[in-house]
């Protein structure tokens, strides 16, 4: 598993669990966008909006929160990761993350998600 990619995904996980909007925002590239479904509702926002509007207004996760990085694939300076979360804000999620290495650092540039 590529260390830099795993570090970026783990930063996202740790930030979500701690309700730390700055940590989550830093895991995303400045131009990151996300799309997906909360139940039947289609949602899209930037990574920065997710960090401030969702994570920034949440309380830290309790013991019910679990996460698993199920897959990481790296080709050159691009990567994809599958992250499954249980008990995040009362729901379970499957996240498909796109990452890019730029200036020596991996960041999330896209997130496609659905509730499970």
State what each model feature region is.
Residues 24, 70-71, 98:
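Short secondary-structure boundary/capping segments
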Residues 1-22, 26-30, 48:
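Short, low-complexity N-terminal intrinsically disordered segments enriched in polar/charged residues
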Residues 31, 75, 103-105:
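Residue-level recognition of short loop/turn positions
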Residues 4, 13, 33-38, 43-92:
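Surface-exposed, charged secondary-structure patches
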Residues 28-29, 85-87, 112-113:
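Short beta-strand segments enriched in hydrophobic/aromatic residues
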Residues 20, 27, 38-40, 47, ...:
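Residue-level detector of alpha-helical recognition elements and their boundaries
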Residues 94-116:
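Short beta-strand edge/turn micro-motifs at domain boundaries
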Residues 31-32, 116:
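Feature marks short, surface-exposed loop/turn motifs that line or immediately flank catalytic pockets
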